[in-house]
Swiss-Prot record:
This is Omwaprin-a. Belongs to the venom waprin family. GO terms for biological process: defense response to bacterium; venom-mediated disruption of cell wall in another organism. Disulfide bonds join 10-35, 18-39, 22-34, 28-43.
Length: 50
C-alpha cells in the first residue's frame, strides 16, 4: 500500500507561492522528496542530519 519513503529530510520551507508540484516521493525525480509546506507540496533535494 504505502511505499517506503526516500531517505533524508525536507529542508526549511521556501518562500514561494502555493503550488502542488507532487503527490508523493515517487512523483519527484532522482533523490528528491515531495515536501509538504502547508498550502504547497514541492519536490526538494533532501537534507541529511546526523
Amino acid at each position: 500500500k504505502d511505499r517506503p519513503k526516500k531517505p533524508g529530510l525536507c529542508p526549511p520551507r521556501p518562500q514561494k507561492p502555493c503550488v502542488k508540484e507532487c503527490k508523493n516521493d515517487d512523483s519527484c525525480p532522482g533523490q528528491q522528496k515531495c515536501c509538504n509546506y502547508g498550502c504547497k507540496d514541492e519536490c526538494r533535494d533532501p537534507i541529511f542530519v546526523g
